[in-house]
Amino acid sequence: MRITQLSSQSFAFPSPELALREPNGLLALGGDLSPPRLLAAYERGIFPWFSPGEMILWWSPDPRAVLYPEDLHISRSMRRFLRNCPYRFTLNHAFKDVIRACATLRDEGTWIGDDVQQAYCHLHTLGHAHSVEVWLENELVGGLYGISVGSLFCGESMFSRANNASKSALMVFCHHFTRHGGELIDCQVLNAHTASLGAIEIPRNFFLQQLSQLQFSPLPAECWLPQSLNFSSAMQ
């Protein structure tokens, strides 16, 4: 099956059902990282993933990794850590710093080049991309970022510079997200880290069905205002 070359004159994408089985989910190439194209992609269950300096590749894997926030797994050791958690948490206080940290701290190398950082920072200024920050005193030690699509959150990347920083960021975010009506977190591709936190794989067509409904259920504006996140209430 041939891969679709995206047109510079249109933001249209081929159906995710046309994605390759190997490599799993590769659907299209080319285009750009402009806000209209990125939003069109996420609204169709498609995301960019490519190496810096290479052509943009667009993916929609089958199966799809997701996390239902109510199924978030908190281990016994994590619960012990959280009882005396030294961190404070914020939302949308340092998006640029979070995505830069995600770009520099990924063990397997990074796909988050300068062009990707600029594109997602632009989405952040438009109110579509969001970050969670973890602070130890005044130092940023962990966080995550992603894209909101209605009551679905497309998680892109997380980082940790201190013990359990990224895990605690996700736990606090899940509480905040569900409290405002959020229903599903897209993890894209399952890995050992997300699986340990409760992420599972579901068929792509089921994910797309859920996406088609959730994207038309926006969360209240106050969900995404820059704010401190209440850690203690998240653990009740």
UniProtKB/Swiss-Prot annotation:
Catalysis: reaction(s): N-terminal L-lysyl-[protein] + L-leucyl-tRNA(Leu) = N-terminal L-leucyl-L-lysyl-[protein] + tRNA(Leu) + H(+); N-terminal L-arginyl-[protein] + L-leucyl-tRNA(Leu) = N-terminal L-leucyl-L-arginyl-[protein] + tRNA(Leu) + H(+); L-phenylalanyl-tRNA(Phe) + an N-terminal L-alpha-aminoacyl-[protein] = an N-terminal L-phenylalanyl-L-alpha-aminoacyl-[protein] + tRNA(Phe)
Cellular component GO terms held in the UniProt record: cytoplasm
Molecular-function annotations in GO: leucyl-tRNA--protein transferase activity
InterPro entries: Acyl_CoA_acyltransferase (IPR016181), Leu/Phe-tRNA_Trfase (IPR004616), Leu/Phe-tRNA_Trfase_C (IPR042203), Leu/Phe-tRNA_Trfase_N (IPR042221)
Coiled coil: none
Pfam families according to UniProt: Leu_Phe_trans (PF03588)
Keyword Iron: no
GO biological process: protein catabolic process
Keywords assigned: Acyltransferase, Cytoplasm, Transferase
Class in the EC hierarchy, top level: transferase
PANTHER family in the cross-refs: LEUCYL/PHENYLALANYL-TRNA--PROTEIN TRANSFERASE, LEUCYL_PHENYLALANYL-TRNA--PROTEIN TRANSFERASE
Similarity annotation: Belongs to the L/F-transferase family.
The protein's role, per its UniProt record: Functions in the N-end rule pathway of protein degradation where it conjugates Leu, Phe and, less efficiently, Met from aminoacyl-tRNAs to the N-termini of proteins containing an N-terminal arginine or lysine.
Protein name listed in UniProt: Leucyl/phenylalanyl-tRNA--protein transferase
